[in-house]
UniProtKB/Swiss-Prot annotation:
Keywords: Ribonucleoprotein, Ribosomal protein
A Pfam family: Ribosomal_L34
Origin species: Bartonella bacilliformis (strain ATCC 35685 / KC583 / Herrer 020/F12,63)
UniProt name for this protein: Large ribosomal subunit protein bL34
Family: Belongs to the bacterial ribosomal protein bL34 family.
């Protein structure tokens, strides 16, 4: 059985990147919450 995590920069950006987050209402909430919390990195 292969490992479940097969790193890919492109897939990571598309799924968890800033633009992917901003594309949905829930994603915008995630960014807002991370801003409030003072996260250095908002998204992948």
């Amino acid at each position: 059985m292969k490992r479940t995590y097969q790193p890919s920069k492109l897939v990571r950006k598309r799924r968890h990147g800033f633009r992917a987050r901003m594309a949905t209402a829930g994603g915008r909430k995630v960014i807002a919450a991370r801003r409030l919390r003072g996260r250095k990195r908002l998204s992948a």
